[in-house]
Amino acid sequence: MIVKGLNIQNFRNIEKAYIEPAEGVNVIFGENAQGKTNLLESIWLFTGCKSFRCRRDREMVGFDAPFAKNEMTFFAKGREQNAHLFIDQKRTAMKNGVTLKSPAELVGEFYAVVFAPSHLSLVKEGPLFRRRFLDTALCELK
């Protein structure tokens, strides 16, 4: 799976951005509070999972914005595909022009693994937390 393009609108502090990653490894860098983690979170949502940073979808919508919209073009399963996420009080999703019953239907279409500072519990907590993290990460791999 390869991300070809990402269009973000009103997602947290990102009012509008279009990103076309280069082939291979891409490095995201910048000053604090400029949206690096927000960018990664917007990509993560296309895995069909919930945010790794908040419980309520509305928290992902930019200040004073009525909604957030993320669109991704990616190459997977031998062809170029697209997915759209619309976020207001909840998330709705489309894949290749078809509205999905739930964003969870994207699970297995796009793969990503996030390791965030909050995951330091992997070292500090017991085996139950480690197993849960590994189960989730392994579900993202083929």
Region locations from a protein language model:
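Nucleotide-state sensing region of NTPase/ATPase domains
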Residues: T47-F129, L134-L141
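Pre-Walker A-like glycine/lysine-rich segment at the N-terminus of P-loop NTPase domains
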Residues: M1-L45
